[in-house]
A protein has these predicted regions:
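Short histidine/acidic/glycine/proline-rich micro-motifs that form metal-
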Residues: 12-14, 58, 88-89, 169-174
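Alpha-helical recognition/docking segments in bacterial nutrient-uptake
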Residues: 47-154, 158, 213
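Short beta-strand segments enriched in small/hydrophobic residues
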Residues: 3-8, 45-58, 155, 163-169
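Short gly/ser/thr-rich secondary-structure transition/capping motifs
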Residues: 33-38, 92, 110-111, 233
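ATP/adenylate-binding site constellation spanning eukaryotic-like Ser/Thr protein kinases
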Residues: 23, 49, 68, 123, ...
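N-terminal helix-turn-helix DNA-binding module of bacterial transcription factors
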Residues: 1-47, 313
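Bacterial carbohydrate/catabolite-sensing allosteric modules
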Residues: 32, 73-78, 127-128, 132-313
């Protein structure tokens, strides 16, 4: 048999040009030999790699794995696989990773950037997820953070809290500014805001400690995320204060196990898996050449009330 005939028989786009009996015979022989098409050669021919690059800043962040899972499941169902890269919150590494994924002919990118001020990827369809890049004009899929923060402040108001503070992460992230701006709009522009250098438990403990040492005499804290909230727990305990008897605390994200801490954390739940699904669907629509669709997709949040909030003391 001519090699060209065998090649056409193995090409899923061309078997109709070859007799069915020949196609079956060639494929049976290929299976017996363990033959698999070379994806690199196929991508050079079709100009499609079958891969999408997914860039995240820190896979140890408990918010990100469910988002990545939603992306992966949706893309796999459409015949695409993910190339996952962790940038360790390093902007230079992020730029290098994006260049490498483009060099590998990724058909698109889904990116959670290390910072809001970094350069946006160019030359390949890109969707931003959870974190925006200033001035990029790229589509963003995220939770409706403002809605969630408003719900947290309203919940505390119902308990009689009037002096509410916001302990949050670094201003280098769009997540921080979205939640901070929503807090100020809901709690008042003079409500104190303290920034930690990361969205971590140690950063939350340090920032909350700064708040307490400043002489703040409030009764409630809206934390920028759940890890910051757990850091606030530690700072309050170190200062001899009890949550929620002395100070109520809310978190944001509803990450795993925050219902198991003491007290169980009242928090804003974001649809983590659904964010990944929506980002993948938006990218697939763009790859298919359809309408560009919305530039911002904000998915609804919900307040989960647990034991860390109570009446103002």
């Amino acid at each position: 048999m001519h090699p060209g005939t065998a090649s056409r028989a193995l090409n899923p786009e061309l078997p109709g040009r070859i007799a069915e009996a020949t196609v079956l015979r060639v494929r049976a022989a290929a299976d017996a030999l363990g033959y698999r098409p070379d994806p690199t050669a196929r991508s050079l021919r079709t100009r499609r790699s079958g891969f999408v690059g997914v860039v995240v800043p820190d896979l140890t962040n408990p918010v990100l794995p469910p988002i990545v899972r939603g992306i992966e499941e949706t893309l796999w169902g459409a015949g695409l696989a993910c190339l996952l890269a962790d940038t360790d919150n390093d902007l230079e590494r992020e730029a290098a990773v994006v260049d490498e994924l483009r060099a590998r002919r990724c058909e698109g990118l889904i990116v959670a950037s290390a910072t809001r001020t970094g350069p946006a990827p160019e030359g390949v369809p890109t969707i931003l997820v959870t974190r925006d890049i200033d001035g990029s004009g790229l589509p963003l899929v995220a939770a409706d953070d403002a809605e969630g923060v408003r719900a947290a402040v309203a919940h505390l108001r119902e308990f009689g809290h009037a002096r509410i503070a916001h302990v949050t992460g670094p201003l280098s992230l769009s997540t921080t500014s979205r939640r901070r701006d929503a807090f100020r709009a809901a709690a008042g522009g003079d409500a104190p805001v303290v920034h930690g250098d990361a969205f971590t438990i140690p950063a939350g403990e340090h920032a909350c400690g700064e708040l307490l040492r400043s002489g703040w005499d409030g009764t409630a804290i809206v934390a920028g995320n759940d890890l910051i909230a757990l850091g606030c727990y530690a700072a309050l305990a170190a200062a001899g204060l009890s949550c929620p008897r002395d100070v109520s605390v809310t978190g944001h994200n509803d990450t795993p196990l925050v219902d198991r801490v003491q007290p169980p954390l009242t928090t804003v739940a974001i649809p983590q898996h659904e964010i990944g699904v929506a980002a993948a669907r938006l990218l697939l629509a763009r790859l298919a050449g359809g309408p560009d669709g919305p530039e911002r997709v904000l998915l609804p949040t919900r307040l989960v009330v647990r034991g860390s909030t109570g009446p103002a003391s």
